[in-house]
Amino acid sequence: MLAVHELEETVIGDLTMFQIDKKTKAEMGHKAVKEILSGLASGESIEQLIFEFDERKTPEAQFAYYCDKLECDIQCKAYDEEGCVDLQHQEKNNTAKNAEVKQLLASGKTWSEMWMTFGQQRYNYDPNFEEVSNFAMQNPITEKGKNK
């Protein structure tokens, strides 16, 4: 499920909630998945895994969903520690224009602290995943971060 859940992004791109509404993204994504997988021997079973992930009703789908969100948190933290985020030049970034995001950044949070805090509030993390996210937020995770 984790290996294939972003297959749609090969067609529609990695669209965020700041770029497109959830319903439209789901419709575009499902159409893209059907097109990509049509005619493949395992196409239907892969399609069902993707749709199961999107619905997040099974324990496996919920686990995969939280893993996906946590991976984004950890990657954001690594980017921050490696100096890949410049908060002074975000004019074209729709995320940085969001009122909640602006408020979190104005409070002095780094980009990754903002992203993780926003994600925890928005995605209603399972307590175990929230604990891992908090650990990543409060501790360096890259060599560069450890040496600061």
Model-based region annotation:
Residues 1-148:
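Alpha-helical, largely C-terminal catalytic domains
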